[in-house]
Amino acid sequence: NANDDLRRILILAFVSGILELGLDVNDYKILLDIQDIERVIRRNKNCGDIVDVKRGNIMVKSSIIAKELMMKTEIFSTNEVFNVLIAIMNKLDNLYLGSDKYKNVMINLVSCSYLSYVFGYQMESNKFIEYYENVKELNFCKKNLFFWEQYAIVCINLKQFDRAGRYFKTAYSLAKQRGHLFSAYQIDNHYARYLLENQLYYRKKEGSLDVFVEAHRLLNKNSEIDIIKKNSRYYKYRVARAYKDYYDTFASKYEESDKDIFLKRCEEMYSSLIQYKRGLDNDEIRRDVRECESALKYILDSENRLS
């Protein structure tokens, strides 16, 4: 009915406005299967305060207001929003080949960080998992490394580590198919986070040093990428903030020889971070980098290893 059509239009308009998807009226007609979109919007007097329809575009007047409304579940339930997004993803799956715009929309709609942003980082575990489960068999998703990496990240965020491990395995398998020249630096960083957080969550001291050594190796194996992709160089420091919790939980209680292995890697990360900071102005240094520096200083100070 007309009210249902209006709600679907507004949900897509809000998501598109928040994520800047660049969809026009024709895209709305195709993706929502509603041909009289302009009339549906204009027939509702209150819509004029929220969205504009002009020059073939549907514009949200304020992405901030759109975000506030998306977070109010009494207006749009999470279930309703995800149902609209699932229907749109199914439509896009038949349209994205040959369309960079639609391909980009699909990338946005499976990005963990973007979806979390739409919902104000209020993640309901069952709803997010249901969403990814509903779209994982789409042609765009099932062989898509980015999709499985994002699904794994969602599972880490929701502390579903067994699932995360399976989906990282799928992502690495797809990365391997791209050949030895493909760099999996992004997956490596997220997988390192998975290794550390999984070990911390279950408080498993047995094997914890081996896990730490592997996580540290993954964070540091892509030094050439650190140089080329300057915008992504902070990723490993964001993950390495967990070294402090790892020290408090496990490493502070290690035998001296094992503790030395741990501390040498902390020194290596600290040296790398200081070198990284030298290339930045003070206002360019991200908060997570500062937090990592503080965490590493805490560890090295505690063991009198800070020169």
Question: Positions of the model-derived regions?
Answer:
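The tetratricopeptide repeat
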Residues: 147, 185-189, 232-242, 285
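Residue signature of alpha-solenoid helical repeat architecture, marking inter-repeat boundaries
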Residues: 141-142, 182, 230, 234
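Terminal, low-structured helical/coil segments at or just beyond the last alpha-helical repeat
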Residues: 272-307
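Alpha-helical repeat scaffolds
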Residues: 85-88, 123-138, 162-174, 203-226, ...
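C-terminal leucine-rich, beta-strand-based interaction scaffolds used for sensing/assembly
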Residues: 16-163, 167-174, 178, 185-186
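Structural register within alpha-helical repeat arrays
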Residues: 109-118, 150-151, 191, 198, ...
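Amphipathic alpha-helical "lid/sensor" segments that cap RecA-like P-loop NTPase cores
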Residues: 1-21
